[in-house]
Design a protein with these regions (language model features):
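Generic N-terminal initiation segments characterized by hydrophobic and/or small/turn-forming residues
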Residues: 1-3, 21, 37
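Intrinsically disordered, low-complexity serine/threonine-rich segments
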Residues: 7-8, 42, 58, 140-144
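Gram-negative (and chloroplast) outer-membrane scaffold detector with strong preference
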Residues: 13-16, 20-30, 59-131, 159-161, ...
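Solvent-exposed loop segments that connect transmembrane elements
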Residues: 31-49, 87-95, 129-142
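Catalytic phosphate/metal-binding cores of nucleic-acid and nucleotide-processing enzymes, i.e., regions
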Residues: 148-150
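Conserved C-terminal beta-signal and adjacent last beta-strands/turns
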Residues: 154-157
Length: 184
């Protein structure tokens, strides 16, 4: 009977914590807004007009471990910010606001060379929507799943500026990111 043990010694200079801000573009298209309008008209409203700025701010925090000179593993939490869709209805007249919030966890492999980096992994996400109207509000789960994400960027002196793409079922979210990593 033999017991084999694999052990990775991680030194303090090989681990780091990161965090930063993200500016998201949510990928909502005119056809998505038209689907909302069509469903509201089907409920009996005379007309429906929906609009969104299709953007929001979020953040991420996490930990990384340097596995080799240019290779590290990262795990973290991401807040996808809030997408707001405003809808004006007539017949009867009503203003409706839909706020969609999301959170997720990420796991990625990151390769860096001469300050530039590329990373890829999976993110497990969860979104909910809150509808507010004159008669009150309601919050409902919109969906959850696990999909791929990737990022590219440049870093120096602990700061990183990059672009990230998150697949969400049959849609997507992209983000410009600014974060700081501190080795400990």
């Amino acid at each position: 009977f033999a017991i084999f043990s694999l052990q990775a010694n991680v030194h303090s200079e090989e681990t780091y914590m990161y965090g930063g801000a993200k500016y998201f573009s949510y990928g909502v298209e005119k056809s998505d807004l038209q689907a909302i309008n069509t469903s509201l008209i089907a409920l009996g409203f005379s007309s429906s007009l929906s609009e969104t700025d299709n953007s929001g701010f979020g953040f991420d925090v996490g930990f990384g471990v340097v596995m080799a000179d240019n290779l590290s593993l990262e795990a973290g939490y991401v807040n996808y910010g809030t997408l707001t869709i405003n809808t004006t209805l007539t017949g009867p007249s009503e203003k409706v606001k839909l706020d969609i919030d999301g959170n997720g966890v990420t796991a990625a492999v990151k390769y860096s060379q001469d300050g530039y980096y590329v990373k890829g992994g999976m993110h497990s996400w969860d979104f909910e929507g809150k509808v507010s109207a004159s008669l009150g509000s309601s919050t409902e789960a919109l969906g959850s799943g696990t999909d791929p994400f990737f990022g590219i960027g440049f870093g120096a002196d602990g700061f990183e500026f990059g672009y990230e793409y998150y697949g969400i079922d049959d849609g997507d979210i992209s983000a410009l990111t600014l974060r700081f990593a501190h080795k400990f």
